[in-house]
Amino acid sequence: MTKAYTIVIKLGSSSLVDESTKEPKLSIMTLIVETVTNLKRMGHKVIIVSSGGIAVGLDALNIPHKPKQLSEVQAIAAVGQGRLIARWNMLFSQYGEQTAQILLTRNDILRWNQYNNARNTINELLAMGVIPIVNENDTLSISEIEFGDNDTLSAITAALVGADFLFLLTDVDCLYTDNPRTNPDARPIVLVPELSEGLPGVNTSSGSGSEVGTGGMRTKLIAADLASNAGIETIVMKSDRPEYVPKIVDYIQHHFRPPRHIGNGTQQQFLDLQDTELEQLRRYDVPMHTKFLANDNKHKLKNREFWILHGLITKGAIIIDENSYDKLLSKDMASLTPNAVIEVRDNFHELECVDLKIGQRLPNGELDISKPIQSVGCVRSNYTSLELAKIKGLPSEKIHDVLGYSVSEYVAHRENIAFPPQF
């Protein structure tokens, strides 16, 4: 019996729009619609993250190249986004399916209640049998609040709704050890147990996105890392054969066996693992793809932790000592107090997300700048950078004496502190 999954399918501009003519690839869009409809009939819930608004706008306005001026790009996006969702609506309506457009910027999820509202809205649409089509709101986004690319947006969307799978559809069938277009000896990478350990023997520097898109393989690796941290399996596969998605899901559910050892191992062990998995794919007649395994329940981020680490924009940094860091990681889950803070960097307001770093404290209480500083997580500070600079290193009971008021005895409460998964 097939389990019902929540599946996010991300399509880049180069998958949906011809790079030279800027015209939509209606044949690919039709295949996507057929695939999503079939997945729904199998009982799965499906969300599409669709790029292409700017590219469709370029075609509609007969503009040959994407301009550099932000206001022009946003105007083009305003034209294209409406036309793009209209095409999706037209294609899905032929199968009796309803769609809904959701345009997001980071500004829409900067508050926890907004983040929850976005999740509730998408889940309500799924419960109604509607197919949400998500895109970044390029008409309103500015560099400070944009996701940067729809690979990242798709990972955040998948984490937002607690999806089971994230499919990143692209112009290659899988990840390779090098660019297969320029290196005939490039080997396919079909299974990555632990992305945080790096990819032994893999060069991901080539390929920086297309004329009509912003992504590349690097952005897909970032998205896969985000999704894995949220407990979501990520699959990279070729966009011109979306009908393979159900077959890959079926293979993972019924035939795939995770490797016995934890992590990627040495470079040779990693490459041997690829040969073993390739044999399995051939045995079950499963098309080539790259599978990034999800973190297990013990190591995956909770929803709020993911929001703090990946949904918010960091402003400034708080540097603490290593002993204080160890206490924050302990089972008692301590909150962050002023006496743990060695130094405050850059400017931030209260409840903004701040980079948390560890450094060495000198005998006089100041930061030892000769020692390395390491980023370890993020916090939402109860105090501004100016306030915190005045109370750093002090016990909590001194806050009122120094500031004349006390917002909290903590710089950040435990629920507003998040660390990447600890292995």
Swiss-Prot record:
Organism lineage:
Eukaryota, Fungi, Dikarya, Ascomycota, Saccharomycotina
Q: Does the keyword Amino-acid biosynthesis apply?
A: yes
Against InterPro entries, the record matches this protein to: AceGlu_kinase-like_sf (IPR036393), Asp/Glu/Uridylate_kinase (IPR001048), G5K_ProB (IPR041739), Glu/AcGlu_kinase (IPR001057), Glu_5kinase (IPR011529), Glu_5kinase/COase_Synthase (IPR005715), Glutamate_5-kinase_CS (IPR019797), PUA (IPR002478)
Q: Does the keyword Magnesium apply?
A: no
Q: Name one GO biological process term.
A: proline biosynthetic process
Compartment list: Cytoplasm
Q: What is this protein called?
A: Uncharacterized protein YHR033W
Q: What family does this chain come from, according to its entry?
A: Belongs to the glutamate 5-kinase family.
Arranged from A to Z, the UniProt key words for this protein are:
Amino-acid biosynthesis, ATP-binding, Cytoplasm, Kinase, Nucleotide-binding, Proline biosynthesis, Transferase
Q: List, for all copies, the residue spans of the domain called PUA.
A: 315-406
Source organism per UniProt: Saccharomyces cerevisiae (strain ATCC 204508 / S288c)
Coiled-coil annotation reads none
Q: Spell out the SUPFAM superfamilies in the cross-references.
A: Carbamate kinase-like, PUA domain-like
- Gene3D superfamilies the UniProt entry points to: Acetylglutamate kinase-like, PUA domain
Name one molecular function that GO assigns to this entry: glutamate 5-kinase activity
Binding sites annotated in the UniProt record for substrate:
51, 138, 150
